Amino acid sequence: RYAGEVMGLSGCGPTALSMVAIFMTGDITKNPRWVADFASQNGYAVDGSGTAWSLMLEGARQIGLSSKEIPVERERVENNLQAGNPIIALMGPGEFTSNGHFIVLTGLQNGRLKINDPNSRKNSEKTWDIDQVLEQTKAVWVYYK
């Protein structure tokens, strides 16, 4: 369980941060369950709401990641992805969610966005129009070495 619900329903935040943590550090012990437990023990899990946004910046720093929030702007997102910096995006209502959902922006392929969606293998296997995704994005956090 996470944030008062089944992890599969409310755990997109810890899962997204786990994906980034393992990619950035190679430490496979920082799996979704580990990040969810960390979030719960440190006040980042909110019953009935999922994950506090602060997990993506403050929580990430506590587990050893360098991160910053950047504006939801195409050029900033593209530049960071081209530099190899993964980005966690908080999605608003649209194609990914009816309320709120965290996904990972992993790169660009032929000018289109590649993502890891903790809730959908199908979404993760295709590429996306970057403007289409950013129109649904509420906030983004970039991770770097």
PLM-predicted stretches and their roles:
Residues L108-K145:
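Noncatalytic regulatory segments and standalone regulatory/sensor domains
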Residues D47-S49, S54, F96-H101, N123-E125:
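Extracytoplasmic/secreted cell-surface and envelope-processing proteins
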Residues K30-N31, A36-V72:
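Mid-length scaffold segments of soluble, non-membrane domains
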Residues G13-A21, P32, A36, W53, ...:
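Extracytoplasmic/secreted envelope proteins and their assembly/folding machinery
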Residues R1-Y44:
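Active-site-adjacent structural segments surrounding the nucleophilic cysteine of cysteine proteases
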Residues R1-V6, I103, W128-D129:
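Short, polar loop/linker segments at the starts of domains and inter-domain junctions
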Residues R61, S66-K114:
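Active-site-adjacent substructure of cysteine-protease-like catalytic cores
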